[in-house]
């Protein structure tokens, strides 16, 4: 409905049909929104996509909280968002040694109260390239809304922060900042933090699944990140 009333400049999955399975359960078919997932090249040199993504995410984050809360989606305050990240780090640290430099960097950011003064907003919660449908530099649709909630808008920017070129990010940030109505001075700093903590989230996923290959991959990625950052604060 938000798209139909021009509140957001992108479409979302629309049900085209469904069928019951013989042994229980159902299959749901959604309409093809068109377009394709962005490539590495798109996130590097596309001249139009940064502004399109910036407008789209700002519009999503500008929606009233009630758009999500009214349909029963979870709602978290800024402090609750911070505490959820702390809990994730604590869970990982109980099982695996996180590089000390990363732990210090993240702990300092999580304890910096100025970073966690922001208005919670409707967020997608798990934006990655396969969730986006683009065509000729324009975002057509966003799918994969199973993690949607009211919370930290930086979470939706984290993947872009980690994947896009510096030039892309500069144009994206300019458009997002211009279009976003609420004041959130540190959203991009938190997005960087979220992009790094995503490795811990992957590690915890491996721990829950008892998948040694995922655990080892995540640990190696954390070690590489620690070397790249070389003790720098956020």
Task: Set out the residue ranges of the language-model regions.
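Extended, well-ordered alpha-helical scaffold segments
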Residues: 49-52, 97-106, 213-225
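ATP/Mg2+ or Mg2+-diphosphate-binding catalytic cores
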Residues: 202-234
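Active-site Asp-x-Gly
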Residues: 135-188
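An alpha-helical support segment within catalytic cores of ATP-dependent transferases
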Residues: 64-124
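ATP-binding pocket architecture of kinase catalytic cores
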Residues: 1-74
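Hydrophobic HxD+1 residue recognition
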Residues: 127
């Amino acid at each position: 409905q938000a798209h139909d009333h021009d509140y957001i400049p992108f479409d979302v999955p629309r049900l085209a049909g469904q069928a019951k399975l013989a042994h229980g359960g159902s299959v749901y078919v959604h309409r093809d929104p068109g377009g394709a997932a962005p490539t590495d090249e798109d996130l590097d040199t596309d001249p139009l996509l940064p502004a399109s993504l910036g407008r789209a995410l700002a519009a999503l984050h500008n929606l009233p909280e009630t758009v999500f809360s009214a349909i029963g989606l979870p709602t978290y305050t800024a402090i609750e968002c911070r505490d959820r990240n702390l809990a994730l780090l604590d869970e990982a640290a109980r099982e695996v040694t996180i590089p000390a430099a990363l732990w210090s960097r993240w702990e300092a950011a999580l304890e910096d109260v100025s970073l966690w003064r922001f208005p919670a907003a409707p967020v997608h919660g798990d934006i990655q390239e396969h969730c986006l449908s683009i065509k000729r530099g324009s975002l057509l649709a966003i799918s994969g809304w199973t993690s949607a909630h009211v919370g930290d808008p930086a979470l939706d920017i984290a993947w872009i922060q980690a994947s896009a070129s510096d030039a892309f990010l500069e144009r994206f940030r300019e458009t997002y900042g211009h279009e976003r109505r609420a004041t959130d001075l540190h959203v991009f700093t938190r997005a960087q933090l979220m992009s790094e903590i995503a490795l811990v989230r992957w590690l915890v996923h491996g721990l829950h699944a008892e998948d040694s290959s995922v655990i080892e991959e995540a640990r190696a990625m954390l070690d590489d990140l620690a070397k790249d950052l070389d003790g720098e604060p956020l």
